[in-house]
Amino acid sequence: EEELAHPARKYAPPHGRLYLVCVGSTPVGCIALKALDDTRCEMKRLYVRPEYRGQGIARALVHQLMQEARVAGYRQMVLDTFPFLPEAITLYKREGFYEIERYNDNPMPGSVYLCCEL
């Protein structure tokens, strides 16, 4: 809850990023980047409202975040997701992510851990 109440604490530049996509004045999607160390970052909070899915918004957000991570000097991006989000896992794998061992303390059983070389 702290993370959502104060997102700038975790996702503010220079080490993080937070993007919000709006259609008109309506927020429809978001994505964030969090530094793990000098060379590795984590993709966080990818979300697109259901009524806006299938329009390439998630893919555009992922591309933007990966480009920003490269510019910031990160060489590797990791993320965790859930097995009940197969569309997200397919998107990540299409963008070059591959499965890795657990890298964090995510308490959700069955989480899927992915990595991409930037």
Q: Where do the protein language model's features map onto the residues?
A:
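A broad, low-specificity signal for short, low-complexity segments enriched in glycine/proline
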Residues: 3-6, 73-79
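Conserved glycine-rich acetyl-CoA-binding loop
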Residues: 26, 40-41, 45, 49-63, ...
